[in-house]
Amino acid sequence: MPNMLEVYKCVHCGNIVEVMHAGGGDLVCCGEPMKFMKEGTSDGAKEKHVPVIEKTATGYKVKVGSVAHPMEETHWIEWIELIADGRSYTRFLKPGDAPEAEFCIQATEVSAREYCNLHGHWKA
């Protein structure tokens, strides 16, 4: 049974879903159960994939990696998500964008996740 804010991917078509409301049953796509995307389990370099969270005057800035991640047509960060006090905030990126996002919110507990089209799901 999926849990709130877990991310799953279809191994056939590549659809990615995030659980917004946890219910019973399994997530299925293309006739098969979707694969749970555990963070940080690919062979990608950690220094280019683990999100770095910075507190700013207006909220939080999330940069992908301590070394800037490539943002090329064949290799880029698709999205950055900030989870703040149990709420989810997402910015979608495209090739050519900077691998970072700003979130103008105030919170006491934050974590960040991102998805690389080649190296998967990562969390800080």
UniProtKB/Swiss-Prot annotation:
<protein>
    <recommendedName>
        <fullName>Desulfoferrodoxin</fullName>
        <ecNumber>1.15.1.2</ecNumber>
    </recommendedName>
</protein>
<keyword id="KW-0560">Oxidoreductase</keyword>
<dbReference type="InterPro" id="IPR038094">
    <property type="entry name" value="Desulfoferrodoxin_N_sf"/>
</dbReference>
<dbReference type="InterPro" id="IPR004793">
    <property type="entry name" value="Desulfoferrodoxin_rbo"/>
</dbReference>
<dbReference type="Pfam" id="PF01880">
    <property type="entry name" value="Desulfoferrodox"/>
</dbReference>
<dbReference type="GO" id="GO:0019430">
    <property type="term" value="P:removal of superoxide radicals"/>
</dbReference>
<dbReference type="InterPro" id="IPR004462">
    <property type="entry name" value="Desulfoferrodoxin_N"/>
</dbReference>
<dbReference type="InterPro" id="IPR051233">
    <property type="entry name" value="Desulfoferrodoxin_SOR"/>
</dbReference>
<keyword id="KW-0408">Iron</keyword>
<dbReference type="GO" id="GO:0005506">
    <property type="term" value="F:iron ion binding"/>
</dbReference>
<feature type="binding site">
    <location>
        <position position="10"/>
    </location>
    <ligand>
        <name>Fe cation 1</name>
    </ligand>
</feature>
<dbReference type="Pfam" id="PF06397">
    <property type="entry name" value="Desulfoferrod_N"/>
</dbReference>
<comment type="subunit">
    <text>Homodimer.</text>
</comment>
<keyword id="KW-0216">Detoxification</keyword>
<comment type="function">
    <text>Catalyzes the one-electron reduction of superoxide anion radical to hydrogen peroxide at a nonheme ferrous iron center. Plays a fundamental role in case of oxidative stress via its superoxide detoxification activity.</text>
</comment>
<feature type="binding site">
    <location>
        <position position="30"/>
    </location>
    <ligand>
        <name>Fe cation 1</name>
    </ligand>
</feature>
<dbReference type="InterPro" id="IPR002742">
    <property type="entry name" value="Desulfoferrodoxin_Fe-bd_dom"/>
</dbReference>
<keyword id="KW-0479">Metal-binding</keyword>
<feature type="binding site">
    <location>
        <position position="49"/>
    </location>
    <ligand>
        <name>Fe cation 2</name>
    </ligand>
</feature>
<keyword id="KW-0813">Transport</keyword>
<keyword id="KW-0249">Electron transport</keyword>
<feature type="binding site">
    <location>
        <position position="69"/>
    </location>
    <ligand>
        <name>Fe cation 2</name>
    </ligand>
</feature>
<feature type="binding site">
    <location>
        <position position="116"/>
    </location>
    <ligand>
        <name>Fe cation 2</name>
    </ligand>
</feature>
<comment type="similarity">
    <text>Belongs to the desulfoferrodoxin family.</text>
</comment>
<feature type="binding site">
    <location>
        <position position="119"/>
    </location>
    <ligand>
        <name>Fe cation 2</name>
    </ligand>
</feature>
<dbReference type="GO" id="GO:0050605">
    <property type="term" value="F:superoxide reductase activity"/>
</dbReference>
<feature type="binding site">
    <location>
        <position position="75"/>
    </location>
    <ligand>
        <name>Fe cation 2</name>
    </ligand>
</feature>
<dbReference type="InterPro" id="IPR036073">
    <property type="entry name" value="Desulfoferrodoxin_Fe-bd_dom_sf"/>
</dbReference>
<feature type="binding site">
    <location>
        <position position="29"/>
    </location>
    <ligand>
        <name>Fe cation 1</name>
    </ligand>
</feature>
<feature type="binding site">
    <location>
        <position position="13"/>
    </location>
    <ligand>
        <name>Fe cation 1</name>
    </ligand>
</feature>
